[in-house]
């Protein structure tokens, strides 16, 4: 297993991250934290640990630089700038494709709260690199017009007792034209603090990623065999 503290370059700042890549990883999960959080989010770290046991690499990174963090703590001007956060994720997706341990691996964007909107925006920009988007208690509505342009599969995970966010996710699901699923975690509130709630999230997300990896493999197999079938039929 490779475990490193990394620095991810973007157009205007460098961002700190923690990259862990188990041996024979099948994909890498890039976490996008919510407003007021960071790469140290205990909930994201718990989910990341579970996903690594399923053979997925993880990158937890800050979406704001240190100076931006300090300013945002006073003004909250960056935390809802979904365009900015989306560009940061795009830069991270591109960076992962330059690293020897993650080059060529499919990328799963896992967003929480406002990070989910940023993940959807990034998925529109990198559909060939992003395998799927997973949203945990997310605000997909904040993705704006990008929501209708997402083409990769999307999983929306929402707590059953998080009524306002559940309603927003139900509306977002109606706007998605890509393959998608809305999964309600029974009795969970917005932060999934209830016993077993985050484990439920990690297990459901892991199964979803397994299925999407299988779909991608099937698609590649079909693409390789389709010309041969066409020649036989003619």
Residue spans of the language-model regions?
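Serine-hydrolase catalytic machinery in alpha/beta-hydrolase-like enzymes
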Residues: 5-102, 191-196, 200
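Alpha/beta-hydrolase fold nucleophile elbow
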Residues: 101-113
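Active-site loop->helix "elbow" adjoining a glycine-rich segment at hydrolase catalytic centers
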Residues: 113-116, 138
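A conserved short beta-strand
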Residues: 128-140
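Short beta-strand/loop motif that positions the catalytic acidic residue
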Residues: 150, 156-158
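Conserved alpha/beta-hydrolase "acid-adjacent" motif
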Residues: 163-169
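Catalytic histidine neighborhood in serine/cysteine hydrolases
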Residues: 176-191
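Catalytic active-site module of serine/aspartate enzymes centered on a nucleophile-bearing elbow/loop
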Residues: 188-191, 196-234
């Amino acid at each position: 297993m490779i475990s490193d503290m990394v620095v991810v370059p973007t157009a205007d700042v460098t961002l700190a991250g923690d990259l862990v890549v188990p041996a024979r990883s099948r994909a890498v999960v890039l976490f996008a934290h919510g407003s007021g959080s960071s790469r140290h989010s205990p909930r994201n770290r718990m989910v990341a640990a579970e996903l690594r046991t399923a053979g997925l690499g993880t990158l937890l990174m800050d979406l704001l630089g240190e100076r931006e963090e300090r300013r945002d703590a006073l003004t909250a001007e960056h935390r809802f700038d979904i365009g900015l956060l989306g560009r940061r994720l795009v830069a991270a997706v591109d960076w992962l494709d330059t690293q020897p341990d993650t080059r060529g691996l499919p990328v799963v964007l896992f967003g929480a709260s406002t990070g989910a909107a940023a993940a959807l925006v990034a998925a529109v920009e990198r559909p060939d690199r992003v395998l799927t988007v997973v949203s945990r208690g997310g605000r997909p509505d904040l993705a704006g017009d990008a929501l209708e342009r997402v083409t990769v599969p999307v999983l929306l995970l929402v707590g059953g007792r998080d009524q306002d966010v559940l309603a927003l996710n139900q509306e977002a699901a109606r706007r998605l034209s890509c393959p998608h699923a809305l999964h309600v975690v029974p009795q969970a509130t917005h932060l999934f603090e209830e016993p077993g709630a985050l484990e439920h999230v990690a297990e459901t997300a892991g199964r979803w990623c397994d299925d999407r990896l299988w779909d991608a493999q099937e698609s590649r197999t079909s693409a390789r065999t389709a010309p041969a079938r066409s020649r036989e039929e003619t």
